[in-house]
């Protein structure tokens, strides 16, 4: 299942079919009615793999939080399904997420103040990877300078009480596959920074 919020990318299902998928479907879930529909949940649960497209993580967070879509993603993960995403679709999979509620935050601004109001973090969404915060387009956009402040941010009480936060930055054309034992394998042409 290819899940997204905005305009369709019609080549993605064919791409997954070429890689060996037996079936694919596009789910354009861009409003609360669709996101909270039992029919949407039931349709999603017919698939073993969920791929969440890039876009804007605020749209995902704002539209899918506390809905049947969030339930489907979490339930499928707990049943052993594969949950993956690219760009914003990956960013929402960690316990601590940068919601981008006020748009992106640039590394130089984030480095100046780890509690900058544009660093909008949340810890009440999917929680697929509970001890991480993910960032993407990492080296290409110089995001080490914002991932460190994300990890140091003290605005969320659940992370104030945690003894560590792991920042994980993934470069373009690169993936990290994390198994149920929290072991990751990097694939692709660049790097993952932890």
Report residues per predicted region:
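N-terminal beta1-alpha1 cap of cysteine-dependent amidohydrolase-like domains
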Residues: 1-53
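C-terminal and late-domain segments of enzyme folds
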Residues: 7-10, 15-20, 97-99, 103-194
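Loop/turn elements at helix/coil->beta-strand transitions in domains of secreted/extracellular proteins
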Residues: 22, 45-49, 79-82, 129, ...
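Catalytic-core regions built around general acid/base machinery
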Residues: 43, 66-80
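A substrate-binding/cap region within the structured catalytic cores of diverse enzymes
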Residues: 47-48, 60, 84, 88-89
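Catalytic nucleophile loop
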Residues: 53-54, 77-97
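Glycine/threonine-rich flexible loop motifs
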Residues: 57-67
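Short, active-site-adjacent cap segments at secondary-structure transitions
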Residues: 57-58, 90-93, 175-177
């Amino acid at each position: 299942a290819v899940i997204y919020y905005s305009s369709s990318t019609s080549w993605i299902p064919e791409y997954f079919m070429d890689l060996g998928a037996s079936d694919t479907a596009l789910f354009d879930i861009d409003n609360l009615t669709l996101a909270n529909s039992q029919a949407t949940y039931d349709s999603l649960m017919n698939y073993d793999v969920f791929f969440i497209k890039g876009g804007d993580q605020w749209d995902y967070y704002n539209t899918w939080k506390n809905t049947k879509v969030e339930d489907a993603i979490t339930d499928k993960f707990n049943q052993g399904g594969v949950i993956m995403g690219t760009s914003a679709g990956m960013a929402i999979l960690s316990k601590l997420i940068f919601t981008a509620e006020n748009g992106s935050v640039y590394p130089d601004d984030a480095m100046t103040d780890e509690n900058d109001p544009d660093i909008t973090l949340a810890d009440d969404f999917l929680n697929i990877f509970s001890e991480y915060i993910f960032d993407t387009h990492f080296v290409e956009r110089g995001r080490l300078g914002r991932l460190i402040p994300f990890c140091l941010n003290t605005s969320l009480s659940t992370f104030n009480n945690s003894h560590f936060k792991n920042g994980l930055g993934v470069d373009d054309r690169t993936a990290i596959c994390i198994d149920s034992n929290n072991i990751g394998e990097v694939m692709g042409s660049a790097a993952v920074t932890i």
